[in-house]
Design a protein with these regions (language model features):
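N-terminal nucleotide-binding beta1-loop-alpha1 segment
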Residues: 8-14
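Short glycine-enriched, charge-decorated loop/helix-capping segments at active-site entrances
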Residues: 22-29, 137-139
Length: 184
């Protein structure tokens, strides 16, 4: 995974991903730690971070003063007037997504971002889902919903990565930017 220095981390519905006990119980602690690690890394490297949806009670991922918070007007983070113009102004070409899959906002955002031409990475172990019941009344556990959602996104819509890979890529992107700035 190679990230440009303009890679934007979208933390989608962190309040769901971390604070909602109904979400994929098996990976709850890991997802919360990974979301917090991604947020900390983007902050430390001075990379752009955008919070989409509500505000988490978890201090490690709560928006800091000056960080962008965007409310969704629909399923996707692009539903509304704020995100796309902001990304255009930043010259962003790459989005890294993490957070909750409860309302399908992360999935809808990934699809829309790909349609708009962004390179999209989804951090699998920094996403959580909720149980779902299909049309036949069968209960699908959150872990299965999460796996299926990631499988649908994998390929032409998004590249699925783990948090360790995304963290290394963020550090490498900033290091490249510093080297290039030193040559200028």
């Amino acid at each position: 995974m190679r990230l440009p220095a303009d890679a934007v981390l979208l933390v989608i519905d962190a309040e769901d991903a971390i604070d909602d006990p109904r979400l994929s119980r098996g990976d709850a602690a890991e997802a919360g730690r990974n979301i917090a690690a991604l947020v900390a890394a983007w902050r430390a490297e001075g990379l752009t971070l955008v919070h989409v949806g509500g505000r988490s009670a978890a201090p490690a991922v709560a928006p800091l003063d000056g960080e962008t918070v965007i409310a969704r007007d629909g399923a996707s983070a692009f539903a509304g007037a704020a995100l796309e113009p902001m990304l255009d102004e930043l010259g962003a070409t790459t989005l890294v997504l993490c957070g909750g899959l409860k309302t399908h906002a992360l999935e809808a955002t990934a699809w829309r971002a790909a349609d708009l031409g962004y390179q999209v990475f989804v951090v699998a172990d920094a996403c959580r889902a909720v149980d779902a019941v299909d049309l036949n009344g069968r209960l699908w556990p959150a872990e299965a919903v999460r796996a299926l959602t990631l499988a649908r996104l994998k390929g032409e819509t998004a590249t699925i990565v783990d948090a360790a890979t995304a963290l290394r890529a963020a550090a490498a992107a900033k290091a490249r930017q510093r080297r290039e700035a030193g040559r200028a």
